[in-house]
């Protein structure tokens, strides 16, 4: 898989406990358990807390590495599924999994969005530092060890991205204007 997003059919917030992830084989038998969170975040509305944990998984093209950036928090979780190397990159001073989760409103700030993965790094859209809603997100690049490589503000708003590694072109779509953008990344990441 390239990426996986969870969409539960029936949400029972009082029964949700994402403190660990289970890796299951094709028959549904548990292969591995990965302890991720100490406990659920406290929140006034338990239905809101699920939104903080609902995040897409993105996989390295060839290795058994998976990342999970969180749309409503400054967290990226890293999982090396062949070892016990699991860790988080978190911007200090921002909401953490040990904090009280505020209720979700129209003013709740988005953080991470669409992501594309290459052999050497992944590119991800970051919205938290925008000064207005029409401003383009930042494009951030990280290596697979969690190190920040490069970052730049995109000139136009886009929500989803795709990447052509042969041409080093990033494509972004603005769903509100029905516009497709092409960004040349030849000088963005240098080896």
What are these regions (language model features)?
Residues 1-19, 36-43:
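Asp-box/WD-like beta-propeller blade repeats and closely related beta-sheet repeat scaffolds
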Residues 21-25, 135-147:
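Beta-propeller blade signature
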Residues 14-20, 72-75, 129-132, 177-179:
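Short glycine/acidic-enriched loop and turn motifs that connect beta-strands
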Residues 10-12, 66, 122, 170:
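Hydrophobic beta-strand positions that form the internal "hydrophobic ladder"
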Residues 162-191:
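Blade-level signature of beta-propeller repeat domains, shared across WD40, Kelch, NHL, RCC1
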Residues 1-7, 49-64, 69, 107-118, ...:
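Structural signature of eukaryotic scaffold interfaces centered on beta-propeller domains
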Residues 29-52, 85-107, 156:
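Surface-exposed loop and turn segments in beta-propeller and other repeat-based domains
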Residues 105-142:
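Loop/turn-rich, solvent-exposed surfaces of beta-rich toroidal or solenoidal domains
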